[in-house]
Design a protein with these regions (language model features):
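Active-site-proximal cofactor/substrate-binding loop regions of enzyme domains
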Residues: 52-54, 72-73, 99-100
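Active-site glycine-rich loops that stabilize anionic/oxyanionic intermediates
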Residues: 12, 74-75
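Solvent-exposed polar/charged
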Residues: 43, 72, 104-105
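Class I S-adenosyl-L-methionine
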Residues: 59-67, 77-160
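SAM cofactor-binding core of SAM-dependent methyltransferases
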Residues: 3-58
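Flexible loop residues that form catalytic
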Residues: 33-35, 75, 116
């Protein structure tokens, strides 16, 4: 039986590529606001029958099928050293809370999220702490008894 997943902030499908290479995963839907990334995603993957949302803030929870795993690389510009590092003062910096909104209702067994190293040290670590300890996150992680592991990896996959 396949593990069903929802691909948030899908980009061109990095998470999906890895999951499909492993095998045993089935995508039930995806979310990507960039039209060119969406075109590439749809050119590379058979998305027929999958639910699509362009904007994470407009995801209608009642329309989402059940899934076991939510994967996503929520937007990093607000935390990256290459950007202005505005954190939660930039709307893009608040999109993690859309993940929390979805997970609170859909209750997948697993979350697999990625972001830039700057998320860990933005605002002296307070941003990452807020994400982990916000009321939504505490309710979500406490209720589901998720264990949280964060790891800083290089592009080659080795720990730093």
């Amino acid at each position: 039986m396949a593990i069903r997943f929802f691909d948030m902030f899908a980009g061109i499908g990095g998470f999906r590529s890895g999951l499909e290479a492993i095998g045993g995963f089935e995508c039930v839907g995806y979310c990507e606001i960039d039209k060119y990334a969406k075109q590439a995603y749809e050119a590379m993957y058979d998305t027929g029958g999958e639910l699509y949302f362009d904007d994470a803030r407009k995801i209608v929870l009642e329309q989402l099928p059940d899934f076991d795993l939510l994967v996503g690389g929520f937007l990093c510009q607000s935390f990256s050293i290459a950007g202005a590092r505005k954190g939660f003062d930039d709307t893009r910096g608040t999109l993690f809370f859309e993940i929390a909104r979805i997970v609170a209702v859909k209750k997948p067994k697993y979350l697999f999220l990625e972001n830039v190293p700057g998320l860990l040290n933005h605002d002296s670590g307070k941003t990452f702490e807020t994400i982990l300890l916000s009321p939504k996150s505490c309710k979500l992680f406490g209720e589901r008894r998720h264990s949280i592991a964060d790891e800083l990896l290089t592009a080659c996959g080795r720990n730093e």
